[in-house]
Amino acid sequence: MAENSDITSLEDSFRKFAIYGDTKATGQEMTGKNWSKLCKDCKVNDGKAVTGTDVDIVFSKVKAKSARVITYEEFTKALEELSAKRFKGKSKEEAYEAICKLVAGKEPVSAGITKAAATGAVDRLTDTSKYTGSHKERFDQTGKGKGKSGRETIVENTGYVGSYKLAGTYDAKVKK
């Protein structure tokens, strides 16, 4: 059979694939979807000797009659069944060890995950250094928003017009 380190890494792979895509999964049981993903990602399913249909049939054989998931023990039985089909020229033990090496230590591959793409228009519209007019007043030099002071003009009841620079200097001129 497989070595002890292979068994632990095989069990580790089982747990990683068992919880893949399911937030409530404990890693003790694997669904048919995740079993198919494991076979595809670990190259057990080569499309010639072992097809997706074979993988599904083996899953149906090893699981309990009314169950929808397989345990680790059923998982090892499924690998034994597939190993004979995948590695036809080898003995049962050699084929099982070969298929264990394919699966051991592997993790689910997330292919086709989309990332947020910043296009030219988005960059142009969200860059605060390029703002003009009254919108420019809403941000400081670093691009951080000023909050309420940037959105609203705060009224100071001093008696002077807002842009008058010499506010408060009249008394100094009159006293002389």
Swiss-Prot record:
Q: Which Pfam families match?
A: p25-alpha (PF05517)
Q: Which UniProt keywords apply?
A: Cytoplasm, Cytoskeleton, Microtubule
Cellular component terms per the entry's GO annotation: cytoplasm; microtubule
Give yes or no: UniProt keyword Iron-sulfur.
no
Q: Does the keyword Cytoplasm apply?
A: yes
Q: Which gene name does the record give?
A: tppp3
Which compartment or compartments is the protein found in? Cytoplasm; Cytoplasm, Cytoskeleton
Q: Which GO terms describe its molecular function?
A: tubulin binding
Main localization of the protein? cytoplasm
Q: Gene3D superfamilies under this entry?
A: EF-hand (1.10.238.10)
Q: Which PANTHER family match?
A: P25 ALPHA-RELATED, TUBULIN POLYMERIZATION-PROMOTING PROTEIN FAMILY MEMBER 3
Function per UniProt: Regulator of microtubule dynamic that has microtubule bundling activity.
**Designated name of the protein:** Tubulin polymerization-promoting protein family member 3
Basic and acidic residues: bias regions: 134-151
Annotated region described as Disordered, given as residue ranges? 132-151
Q: Which domain of life is it from?
A: Eukaryota
Can you name the source organism?
Xenopus laevis
Gene Ontology biological process terms from the UniProt entry: microtubule bundle formation; microtubule polymerization; positive regulation of protein polymerization
Q: Which family does it belong to?
A: Belongs to the TPPP family.
